[in-house]
C-alpha cells in the first residue's frame, strides 16, 4: 500500500481571531497530533485557546497546504502580572534567585508552536516562529519547553534563546521545563538550511 504524500506548505499568513476561531478544530488537531496527546485534550484546550485570543498583543501565524489545510500554527501575546504562566515563572525565578523583574517586563509570551507531523522536516517551524516574532510586541520573548535534547531545543538555541530558568516544574505537570528568552527583534535568518520541525515545538502545555 502506498502512503499518502505529506502535505506541503503553500502559504504562511497571519490569522485574525475570527480566522483562528473558524480553524480552531484544525489547529487543536495539529496540537494533539504533534504532541502525542489523547484526542480528548483538544476539547479541553479549546476554551483556553479562545481566552488567549482576547489578551493584549495576541497574534497568530498559520501555515497552509496547497489544499488549504492548516498544517502549522503558532501564537502568543503580551505577558502580564496575574496570568498563570507569568506568576509561575515569577515564582520560579524568585525561588532560584533569578532576576524576575528583568525578564518579566515588556515581554511577548510564545505560547504555542506546532507543525503537523507529516509536514515536519523542512524548516516550517522556524519560518512560523520568525513570522510570529517579526512584529511581536515587547522588547523580549519568553517561552517554556520540556527539558531534553529535542529539535525544539536546537531551533531555539539556533535563533538565540538563552536560559532564564531550568528544570522548573509548573504546577500540575511533573515534567521538568526550561524557560528560555531572548531580546526582540530576531536577527535575520542565515543562509544555513533550517533544521526540521519537531513534535516538541510547543512552547508550553498549561496556562490559565
Regions found by a protein language model. Name each.
Residues 38-71, 75-81, 98-99:
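Active-site rim helix/loop that mediates acceptor-substrate recognition in acyltransferases
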Residues 75-112, 171-173:
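Conserved acyl-donor/pantetheine-binding loop and adjacent beta-alpha core of acyl/acetyltransferases
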Residues 31, 156, 161:
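Conserved active-site tyrosine of GNAT-family acetyltransferases
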Residues 28-42:
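Helix-loop element at the rim of GNAT/NAT acetyltransferase active sites that forms part
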Residues 98-104, 108, 114-117, 127-140:
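Conserved acyl-CoA
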Residues 115-120, 133, 142-153, 169-176, ...:
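Conserved beta-strand-loop-alpha-helix junction that forms the acyl-donor binding cleft
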Amino acid at each position: 500500500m502506498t502512503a499518502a504524500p505529506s502535505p506541503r506548505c503553500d502559504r504562511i499568513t497571519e490569522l485574525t481571531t475570527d480566522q483562528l476561531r473558524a480553524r480552531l478544530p484544525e489547529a487543536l488537531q495539529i496540537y494533539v497530533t504533534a504532541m502525542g496527546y489523547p484526542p480528548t485534550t483538544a476539547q479541553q484546550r479549546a476554551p483556553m485557546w479562545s481566552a488567549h485570543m482576547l489578551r493584549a498583543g495576541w497574534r497568530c501565524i498559520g501555515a497552509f497546504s496547497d489544499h488549504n489545510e492548516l498544517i502549522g500554527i503558532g501564537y502568543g501575546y503580551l505577558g502580564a502580572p496575574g496570568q498563570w504562566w507569568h506568576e509561575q515563572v515569577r515564582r520560579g525565578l524568585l525561588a532560584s534567585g533569578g532576576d524576575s523583574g528583568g525578564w518579566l517586563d515588556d515581554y511577548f509570551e510564545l505560547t504555542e508552536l506546532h507543525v503537523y507531523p507529516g509536514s515536519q522536516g523542512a524548516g516550517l517551524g522556524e519560518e512560523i516562529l520568525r513570522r510570529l516574532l517579526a512584529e511581536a510586541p515587547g522588547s523580549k520573548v519568553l517561552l517554556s519547553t520540556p527539558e531534553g535534547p529535542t529539535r525544539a531545543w536546537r531551533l531555539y538555541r539556533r535563533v538565540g534563546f538563552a536560559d532564564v530558568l531550568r528544570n522548573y516544574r509548573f504546577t500540575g505537570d511533573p515534567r521538568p521545563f526550561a524557560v528560555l528568552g531572548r531580546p526582540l527583534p530576531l536577527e535575520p535568518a542565515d543562509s544555513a538550511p533550517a533544521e526540521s520541525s519537531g513534535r516538541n515545538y510547543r512552547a508550553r502545555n498549561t496556562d490559565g
